[in-house]
Each structure stands twice: as structure tokens, then as C-alpha cells.
């Protein structure tokens, strides 16, 4: 083995071996165990969330594979409708070509060309992270098979009365000209205004104060052209007498009613709210409750129409309401219209005031444009009939959420579910399988031939397919079963569905998880007709944030690419990566400064195993995962520790009883074997419960602290002892080898590369056969090998050695200097342990002599420590220069007093505490606590030495 651990020297070659040997394919004889990879967007590259997600899924798959389960981890990518279309459009625009010039078919050809060129990027990254997915089953949401499944699902849902076309309010992107989902809308906190406008009362009505007008407050004065009512709270005494009366809508002259609705907050503004059902989601709900007309005043660009389009709630034209609008505003952009309408109110004496107001402004996450609630014809899934069985599946335990608290989030969304808009005005995606004749009548079918045959439509009747495509979430909602061959009854579907676990972030429980559950329960049935669930467990993890708890985003400049941590990146390349392609280029300087401060030397290459172990160690039950580069460095050191331990074991491991020769186990051997059983049980228990953090912690504690720090040291005196029997030395060598071999198997799901590399060399010594560690059996604890007596004896031994080590440290005595040791208050058990471990203690604690003092015997002036009730004494005569040591301690105490004063002063400064970020204050408080504790210890040490 190389002297130092170099991850890049082993990782790629091992992955190629695993893949070429087909080790990732299903092959276990046990029950199936299936995970479907949440398909990343084909446009992108893996971010830290993907890296985290993959580490968790691979740990599960490798764990279950080693347990003998018939594992399938199936990879794939999502066609990502809007993201992909925008990306290819931008590429074409750079060449001076628009998609409209190309036409739909040629534009789609360009997208497929682009996918062929760059679609392999995600696959390359997944490989680099060591993910043991079955590449022979890689799928894409626009594959032919998946396209057939999508059409089938649409047609069946339509036949069951669960898909319909209707005119409703949607999030409209005025730049991309498509409806978008709530997940694609980002709410930005901005400073805006609240306009207070007078609306004259009609028919001579007066308020309780005798006024002939109401004052309404609005953040969007331009939408007043589409007002359908003014609402007040039914309990608001000021306006009770006006409910049912009318106001005259300024500038337009239309009479609109005053209605009572609990939506109005009497404390906000004047308590009167204008209701515009066609341009505000809350107003739309009020409109439904009061059967108000919907007046659409904007076109698809959010420019004012010459006349409002007036509809009833059922989407049919309302011809009884006059949609006339002032000609002055026709064709104006919504923000220009706002200026002119406010000016007209002012000129008419109807503008009361303009107040500053904090707003949440909805913007498209791709286009950056302000989203307009807009009334348009779209396709919808009727979700309430699908939600009820989906709620029941979680309530009755067929699907479990881990952690369980996320069930409440799921239930709250599902019990307040709205119909799902599934159409998008894009070209890239699954085209809706619906056709229209010249009269606008719609026909749904799997293809045009089926539509004609089913409806007896001859060739003389022209049919035009719907131009819209389906929401990406619709096809990904079928992901667990469409990728296994549904609607055909394939062997793969029969074997691997329902899947076992879905690993996902909490942010898409509604957008993806809930929809998968609803669609699967409705579309996939067992032989007896009972519905199948898509997965049995949903493991929900938090969002990966930076070390300060900030969300990682391009605009914050704190994004980390997992592969940059794996392979390393120099500072200049990192700066270039973080500052290029920004939506807000003005942030580039700030991001560059921040990056140069945080990563002055770039990012070192830590390797995949260190990153994966970091992710697993962070996988707690919280909603936030604070990613800390210090942890990666720590786990890279852990890899080094394992590597160095393996080099020692391989060096000492020959003649370890691999051919059945006799062995005798020492106390330390029995202890480490006992600890191994406990670790096997603990790691298995925590993985079964999805506590990857606790499993990683148990593994780290065993390998680093027990095996490397203690057992390797305890093994050395046995191997050096010329008086030890061959059987005793062979027993220690065998224990060194076999315990490490089992520990490697336990660590393999977390750290696949380093464990495989070492295992290949160690397996012959351990008497283990097999081509790869990944197909070795998972370790199972043997309770018969738990040796409580050995554990108690070694804990006592460790206590004594640590006591001596601490005295050396406190008294500044070199580790190689032999010590005399006196012991008082020695019990019979202590005496036995001293006798049995005399040689071990003398060697490891560097003891010149050990003397047990009888009761009443005087001890020389000594530094002391306790091990249980036994007193440990180290005479100081000749070991330290008392004066020099006190002077050294005085100097250090003085330095720490200065530090306490400096940090304490900073924290008592109100100006600092008020202005500094919380994480900076927390760091300063931690610094103060640390300095105070160190000062206390040094003062104790000073007193002890002064008393000698």
C-alpha cells in the first residue's frame, strides 16, 4: 500500500471495475429492495443537495445489498421543461435565431441534439460520487416508454373524470408566456407602496361618519380596472349599513357591490378592500364565495386590453357585465398603466395618500419577471378525490414519513389541496394528448388514430392537437412505476414495485411526493385490484446550507459544487465559477471578495469518501443541514487514520491463523471483539432507523477511538513481548486483521472506495473469499462474544493510563520520560488488574516502577489523580523545574486574562452586540467561554505545582 492515502489514485478505477463487473445490477436472493433516484434536471449539474441525497441513497442500497436483498437503485434524469427550453433558446439567440423562426419540430430537434451533447454530465457526476446505480436501467422522462406511460395516465385520468379543461387563475410568466407552478415562483421582500384611493358611494349612500365615499387601500392600483366588488368585514360596525349597497368605480364608471367577507382585516388600512378576482389569488377565492364576475384586463404580456374579458366562475363568457375600459390605457404595460391611473386619481381628487409598504413580490425563478395572476384556459387534475386515499395510505401506515413530524406537513397540504394545473405553454415536454375540431370540441386519446376511431371522425374532419405540454411534475409523478414498464405488466414492475424508500428534501413533499402517492394509488393496482403505494417509506432530509446557515444560492455566492470538494479547485477557477453567469452581475465584486476570504488557498482535494461520510454524519432529523468544510477535513483525516491503521495491520498481519492454526486471545483482543459486536448492532440499528448521523458516529467512535487509538497501541506490547507465546501473538494478529476486515464492511456503505481498496489486500489474511467487498455479507453481532469482564478491565486500564497521561500533560513532563508510580486505596480488583497487566502498563505508560502503598504509608510529594477510588501518585522530585514551570504558567495565565478582558469587553459593548450578525456574536461568546475554562484549568495547575 502507498504510504499516504491518495483518493484520486483509487476512486475512478474502482468505480470502473464495479460497473464493468455488473455489481450494481439486482442479484441478491432475498426480498427486493428498490430506490428510484429523484431525477435531477438534465440541464444542470449536481449541487450539494444532490450530493447529500446520493450519499444517503447509496448508503442504504449498499447496506441492503450486503444484507442479501435483491437491490435495484435506478437512475435517470428529468426533461425539466422550462429550464431546458430556456437554455436551448438562449443558445439559439446567441446565433441570432429564435425558436419561432425555427418552428416547433426543428426547435425540438435542437433540444434533442443538445441533450445528446450534454446529457451525460449528470451521469458522470453520479459516477464520481460512487453511486452504485444500475446504469443498464437509466431512464429519461421523455423516453419513448415513459411518453407512452404519460399518455396512458392522462387518458385514464380523463376517462375517470379526474382531468378537465377550465378557465382559472394561474401564475403567469409574462416573459416566458406560460403558466408556472408555485415552486417556480420566488417571493422577494421589497419596499413598495400602499395607495389609498377614494371610491364614491352610489345612489346617495353615506358612511356612518356621513362621507359619500369609501377609502380602499391597494398595492396594485392598475388592477382597479378589473374590480368586481369592495369587501368589508361583516363584524366591522363602520360599514355594516353599507353591505349590499354599491360604489361607482372611478375612471370606469361601473357599479360594483359592497360585500361582507371575513377575508378583510378591520385593522388593516381603512378596513375596505378592493376585490379583483381575475388578478389576485385571494380575491379569486372571495369571488368564488360571492359569485362575482371575473374581469380579465390584461393580455399575455400583461398589457391592458381595449376591453375587459368578462367570465363567470365556470369559465363561460358573461355578457351581462360591461367590460368597457378607458381607451387611454389600452395597450399600456401594467406598470405604465399604474403611473397613469394613479395620476388620474390624483387629478380627480380621489388619491388620499401614498404610504411606504413592505411587499412580497412574486417573481419567476427562471425569467426573473414579476408573475401575474392571470385567467387562462388550462388543463387541471381534480385532486380532492385523489387526496383522500393518499391521506389514508399515510394514516394507516402503508406509507411512513421519517422523521414522523413531516406527516403533519403532508396532511395539512393534502387537506387543503387545490386542483392541479398540469398544462404549460411550452414546446419541450409531453404534448397533451388532446385534439380539437374546427368548432373547438375537444377529444382525448392516446393518439389521433385512436381519437378518430373512438369518435367516428372521418378524414374530412380536420383535427389539431393541443399545443400545450404537461407540467414536468406530472411525468415525474409517475416515476416509480413508469420506469419499470407500466402500463405493461412487466417482470420488473412485479418484482420492484412498490419501491422501498424515497429520499427527498422537505421542500418538495407537496409538489412531488404527494402527487406520486395520488397518481400511483389511482393508476397501479395489485392482482386483486387493491392500490399500490409508490414507496413504503419517505425519508425526508433538511436543506443543505452553508456554515452560517444561509441557503446556498448563486446570487449569495456561497454555492459549493460537491465535485470541487472531491477533486479540489484552485482559487481563481473558484472565483470565476462563482461570479460568471450571475442574474445580478453587480454582485460579482462582493462574491469575489467573500470567496477570496473564505477560500484563500482554493479547496483541497478531499476525495469522495470524506465528503460522503460528512453528508451521512450531518443527516440528522433537523430541517437545516449546516455544511462545514472543517468536517470534511476532519473526515479526510479519518480516512488517513484508517489507511495508516491498515498499513500497520498488513505489516504485522502475517501468520494470523488464517489456515486454522491455534490462537490465544489477550484481554485487549477479547475487549475489541466485544466492542465490535456492540458497534455492529448499533450501526445496523441506526441504519434501520434512518439515523445515518448516529450510525456514522458509532462507526467513527469505534474505528478511531477504540480500534486505532487504543487497540493498536494495546497490541504492540503483545507483539513485542519476547516471552509471549506464539498462540498469544497469533491471536493478536488475527484479531487485528479480522476486526479491521469487519469494520471495513461496516464502513463500506458510507466510504465505498477506501474500504474496497484496503479490503482487497486484507481479505486473504482474514480468510475471506470474494471478488468485492460490496457483495460481502453485512456483519451481524454475536452476543456470545460480548465480554463484559474484558470491557470492565480495559476501561480500568484506560483510566489508569489516561491518569498518568494527564499528569504528564499538566506537569509538562515529556511522554518518553520514565515515571515512578505509587498507588493508594487499591482494591482486590485493582490489585488483580495491576498484576495481570503489569507488562502492558509499564510499556504503554512508560513506567519505571509501580508501588502499591499500604494503609498509613507516607507518599512522597506527588501529582495525583483518581481512577475510581484508587489514588494514582507520580512523585515530582527531579521531574520538573518548579520555578520555571510556575513562570511559564504565569505567562500563559496573563495572556488568557488579556483575552478574557478583550472578548468580554467586546460582548459588553452594546454597539457591537446590536450590529454584529448572530453567528459572529455566538463565535465570540464561545471564544470567551473557552478562554475562561482554560484560565480556570491553568489556575488549578498553578496551585498544584506551587504546593509541591
Curated annotation (Swiss-Prot):
Signal peptide: none annotated. CDD domains: Anticodon_Ia_Val, ValRS_core. The keyword S-adenosyl-L-methionine does not apply. A motif ('HIGH' region) lies at residues 40-50. It is an enzyme of class 6 (ligase). Residues 879-945 form a coiled coil. Its EC number is 6.1.1.9. It catalyses: tRNA(Val) + L-valine + ATP = L-valyl-tRNA(Val) + AMP + diphosphate. Keywords: Aminoacyl-tRNA synthetase, ATP-binding, Coiled coil, Cytoplasm, Ligase, Nucleotide-binding, Protein biosynthesis. PROSITE patterns: AA_TRNA_LIGASE_I. A motif ('KMSKS' region) lies at residues 551-555. Catalyzes the attachment of valine to tRNA(Val). As ValRS can inadvertently accommodate and process structurally similar amino acids such as threonine, to avoid such errors, it has a 'posttransfer' editing activity that hydrolyzes mischarged Thr-tRNA(Val) in a tRNA-dependent manner. Belongs to the class-I aminoacyl-tRNA synthetase family. ValS type 1 subfamily. ValRS has two distinct active sites: one for aminoacylation and one for editing. The misactivated threonine is translocated from the active site to the editing site. The C-terminal coiled-coil domain is crucial for aminoacylation activity. This is Valine--tRNA ligase. The lineage of its organism: Bacteria, Pseudomonadati, Pseudomonadota, Gammaproteobacteria, Pseudomonadales.
Amino acid at each position: 500500500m502507498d504510504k499516504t492515502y491518495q483518493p484520486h489514485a483509487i476512486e475512478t478505477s474502482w468505480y470502473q471495475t464495479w460497473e464493468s463487473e455488473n455489481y450494481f445490477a439486482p442479484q441478491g436472493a432475498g426480498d427486493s429492495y428498490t430506490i428510484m433516484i429523484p431525477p435531477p434536471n438534465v440541464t444542470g449539474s449536481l449541487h450539494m443537495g444532490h450530493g447529500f441525497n446520493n450519499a444517503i441513497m447509496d448508503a442504504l442500497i449498499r447496506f441492503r445489498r450486503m444484507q442479501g436483498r435483491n437491490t435495484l437503485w435506478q437512475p435517470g434524469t428529468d426533461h425539466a421543461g422550462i429550464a431546458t427550453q430556456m437554455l436551448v433558446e438562449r443558445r439559439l439567440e446567441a446565433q441570432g435565431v429564435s425558436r419561432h423562426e425555427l418552428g416547433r419540430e426543428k426547435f425540438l430537434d435542437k433540444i434533442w441534439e443538445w441533450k445528446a451533447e450534454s446529457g451525460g454530465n449528470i451521469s458522470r457526476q453520479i459516477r464520481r460520487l460512487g453511486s452504485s446505480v444500475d446504469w443498464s436501467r437509466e431512464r429519461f422522462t421523455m423516453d419513448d416508454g415513459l411518453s407512452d406511460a404519460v399518455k396512458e395516465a392522462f387518458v385514464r385520468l380523463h376517462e375517470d373524470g379526474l382531468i378537465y379543461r377550465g378557465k382559472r387563475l394561474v401564475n403567469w410568466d409574462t416573459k416566458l408566456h406560460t403558466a408556472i407552478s408555485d415552486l417556480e415562483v420566488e417571493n422577494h421582500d421589497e419596499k413598495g407602496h400602499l395607495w389609498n384611493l377614494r371610491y364614491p358611494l352610489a345612489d346617495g349612500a353615506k358612511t356612518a361618519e356621513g362621507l359619500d365615499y369609501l377609502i380602499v387601500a391597494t398595492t396594485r392600483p392598475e388592477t382597479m380596472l378589473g374590480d368586481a366588488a369592495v369587501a368589508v368585514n361583516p363584524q366591522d360596525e363602520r360599514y355594516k349599513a353599507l353591505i349590499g349597497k354599491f360604489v361607482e368605480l372611478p375612471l370606469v364608471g361601473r357599479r360594483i357591490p359592497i360585500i361582507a367577507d371575513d377575508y378583510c382585516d378591520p385593522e388593516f388600512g381603512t378596513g375596505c378592500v378592493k376585490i379583483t378576482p381575475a388578478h389576485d389569488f385571494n380575491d379569486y377565492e372571495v369571488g368564488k364565495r360571492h359569485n362575482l364576475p371575473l374581469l380579465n384586463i390584461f393580455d399575455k404580456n400583461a398589457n391592458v386590453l381595449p376591453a375587459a374579458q368578462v367570465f363567470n366562475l365556470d369559465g363561460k363568457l358573461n355578457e351581462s357585465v360591461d367590460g368597457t375600459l378607458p381607451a387611454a390605457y389600452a395597450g399600456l404595460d401594467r406598470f405604465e398603466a399604474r403611473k397613469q391611473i394613479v395620476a388620474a386619481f390624483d387629478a380627480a381628487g380621489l388619491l388620499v395618500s401614498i404610504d411606504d409598504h413592505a411587499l412580497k413580490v412574486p417573481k419567476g425563478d427562471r425569467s426573473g419577471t414579476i408573475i401575474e395572476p392571470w385567467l387562462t384556459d388550462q388543463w387541471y387534475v381534480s385532486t380532492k378525490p385523489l387526496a383522500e386515499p393518499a391521506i389514508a395510505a399515510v394514516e394507516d401506515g402503508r406509507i411512513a414519513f421519517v422523521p414522523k413530524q413531516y406527516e403533519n406537513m403532508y396532511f395539512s397540504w393534502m387537506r387543503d389541496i387545490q386542483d392541479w394545473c398540469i398544462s404549460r405553454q411550452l414546446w419541450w415536454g409531453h404534448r397533451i394528448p388532446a385534439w380539437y375540431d374546427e368548432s373547438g370540441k375537444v377529444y382525448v386519446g392516446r393518439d389521433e388514430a385512436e381519437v378518430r376511431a373512438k369518435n367516428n371522425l372521418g378524414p374530412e374532419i380536420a383535427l389539431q392537437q393541443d399545443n400545450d405540454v404537461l407540467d414536468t411534475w406530472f411525468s415525474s409523478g409517475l416515476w416509480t412505476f413508469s420506469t419499470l414498464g407500466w402500463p405493461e405488466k412487466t417482470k420488473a414492475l412485479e418484482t420492484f414495485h412498490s419501491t422501498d424508500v424515497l429520499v427527498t428534501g422537505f421542500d418538495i413533499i407537496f409538489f412531488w411526493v404527494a402527487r406520486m402517492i395520488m397518481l400511483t394509488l389511482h393508476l397501479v393496482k395489485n392482482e386483486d385490484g387493491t392500490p399500490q403505494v409508490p414507496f413504503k417509506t419517505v425519508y425526508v432530509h433538511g436543506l443543505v446550507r452553508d456554515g452560517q446557515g444561509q441557503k446556498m444560492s448563486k446570487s449569495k455566492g456561497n454555492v459549493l459544487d460537491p465535485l470541487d470538494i472531491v477533486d479540489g479547485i484552485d482559487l481563481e477557477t473558484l472565483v470565476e465559477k462563482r461570479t460568471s453567469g450571475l442574474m445580478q452581475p453587480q454582485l460579482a465584486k462582493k462574491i469575489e471578495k467573500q470567496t477570496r476570504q473564505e477560500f484563500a488557498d482554493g479547496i483541497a482535494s478531499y476525495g469522495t469518501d470524506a465528503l460522503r461520510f460528512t453528508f451521512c454524519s450531518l443527516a440528522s432529523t433537523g430541517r437545516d443541514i449546516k455544511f462545514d468544510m472543517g468536517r470534511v477535513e476532519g473526515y479526510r483525516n479519518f480516512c488517513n487514520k484508517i489507511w495508516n491503521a491498515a498499513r500497520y495491520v498488513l505489516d504485522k498481519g502475517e501468520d494470523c491463523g488464517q489456515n486454522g492454526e491455534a490462537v490465544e486471545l489477550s484481554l485487549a483482543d477479547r475487549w475489541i471483539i466485544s466492542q465490535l459486536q456492540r458497534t455492529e448492532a448499533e450501526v445496523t440499528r441506526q441504519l434501520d432507523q434512518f439515523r445515518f448521523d448516529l450510525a456514522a458516529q458509532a462507526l467513527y467512535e469505534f474505528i478511531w477511538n477504540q480500534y486505532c487509538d487504543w487497540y493498536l497501541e494495546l497490541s504492540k506490547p503483545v507483539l513485542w513481548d519476547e516471552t509471549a507465546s506464539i498462540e498469544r501473538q497469533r491471536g493478536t494478529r488475527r484479531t487485528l486483521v479480522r476486526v479491521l476486515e469487519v469494520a471495513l464492511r461496516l464502513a463500506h456503505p458510507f466510504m465505498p472506495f477506501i474500504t474496497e481498496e484496503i479490503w482487497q489486500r486484507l481479505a486473504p489474511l482474514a480468510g475471506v473469499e470474494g471478488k468485492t467487498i460490496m457483495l460481502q455479507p453485512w456483519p451481524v453481532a454475536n452476543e456470545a462474544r460480548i465480554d463484559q469482564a474484558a470491557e470492565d478491565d480495559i476501561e480500568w486500564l484506560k483510566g489508569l493510563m489516561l491518569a498518568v497521561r494527564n499528569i504528564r500533560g499538566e506537569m509538562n513532563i515529556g511522554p518518553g520520560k520514565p515515571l515512578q508510580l505509587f498507588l493508594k486505596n487499591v482494591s482486590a480488583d485493582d490489585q488483580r488488574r495491576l498484576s495481570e497487566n503489569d507488562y502492558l502498563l509499564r510499556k504503554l505508560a512508560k513506567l519505571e516502577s509501580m508501588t502499591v502503598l499500604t494503609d498509613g504509608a507516607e507518599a512522597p510529594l506527588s501529582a495525583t489523580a483518581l481512577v475510581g477510588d484508587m489514588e494514582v501518585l507520580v512523585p515530582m522530585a527531579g521531574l520538573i523545574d518548579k520555578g520555571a514551570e510556575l513562570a511559564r504558567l504565569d505567562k500563559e495565565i496573563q495572556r488568557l486574562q488579556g483575552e478574557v478582558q478583550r472578548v468580554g469587553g467586546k460582548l459588553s459593548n452594546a454597539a457591537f452586540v446590536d450590529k454584529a450578525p448572530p453567528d459572529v456574536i455566538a463565535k465570540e461568546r464561545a471564544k470567551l467561554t473557552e478562554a475562561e475554562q482554560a484560565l480556570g484549568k491553568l489556575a488549578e495547575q498553578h496551585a498544584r505545582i506551587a504546593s509541591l
